[in-house]
């Protein structure tokens, strides 16, 4: 696949939402970015709390900006807080270095990232991975 299409982004979104329903977790916001960082799709389930859209976007944006899933970014923040703080300053505070931001890959090609927020970071990540894999792509959570 040369780039992440809107149709594929919708498949990722729909499958991630289906996983959330299956797991009976708290309402989620899911954002899918392409490799340029452009929003392909975003959706909020009914009942999401304030700031969830910004958090979901920040998880995907951080993963994409640094080329690592947000779980790895979280670990990097714990080990080298000064580095993540500096990068987040450059990114005008848009990085959210906690699990739930997952890179979308096809073979070795980076297509974009998914960010999920609303439940625990681990559950957010599970839904992101499910969406990506349902679209026949490789999920890289870090």
Pin down the residues of each PLM region.
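Flexible, solvent-exposed loop/hinge segments and secondary-structure transition points
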Residues: 1-142
């Amino acid at each position: 696949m040369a780039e992440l299409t809107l149709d594929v982004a919708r498949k990722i979104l729909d499958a991630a939402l289906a996983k959330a329903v299956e797991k009976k977790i708290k309402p989620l916001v899911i954002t899918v970015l392409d490799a340029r960082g452009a929003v392909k799709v975003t959706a909020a389930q009914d009942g999401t709390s304030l700031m969830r859209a910004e958090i979901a976007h920040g998880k995907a944006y951080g993963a994409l900006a640094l080329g690592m899933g947000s779980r790895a970014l979280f670990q990097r923040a714990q080990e080298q807080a000064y580095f993540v703080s500096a990068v987040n300053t450059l990114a005008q505070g848009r990085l959210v270095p906690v699990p739930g931001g997952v890179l979308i890959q096809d073979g070795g090609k980076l297509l974009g990232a998914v960010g999920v927020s609303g439940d625990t970071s681990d559950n957010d990540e599970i839904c992101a991975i499910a969406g990506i894999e349902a679209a026949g792509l490789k999920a890289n959570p870090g």
